[in-house]
Amino acid sequence: MIKVPTSIYLRTLDCKEFDFSAFARTHDCVVFIYPKIGEDFELLSEQLQKTAGMKGCTKQAINYKKLLKEFNDLGFMVVAIGSQDIAAQKKFEEETTTGVMFLNDSEFMLERALELPVFAASNGHKFYFRQTLIIKGGNIRRAYIVDEPENDAKNMLEKIKNEDY
């Protein structure tokens, strides 16, 4: 268990600074961090292309949408964090209409603050590995690398229901 560090500032999709630290210290939440690689997929090494969980951002987001009320009823907000440019992220949010809070971390603040794993395409574009954090009481209770994006929401909901975090 890790206390959420201070001074993690991300961006909202309307480009406003957002104090993620203050938010995460005062809200229980499930944070899914997705790579949304897009065209850069072809520029990944063969090993990365074969890594489980590299594809599936849309399925992951839509499944969180389907279970959002259940997360909320258990006292958890759902937050989606991506590192692509804000225009692309805004388009993704509009396409999935999930109703979750989307935040942008194109500066990789979470990588520095929490040492979250990242990777890069051959053109230098950097991405987070797909991962989900369960935050409760201002503490990061668990961090999971996600290799089955389509099952992530269901799996996290089960962990919360069973207090397995």
PLM features: residue spans?
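Chalcogenol-based redox active-site neighborhoods
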Residues: M1-Y165
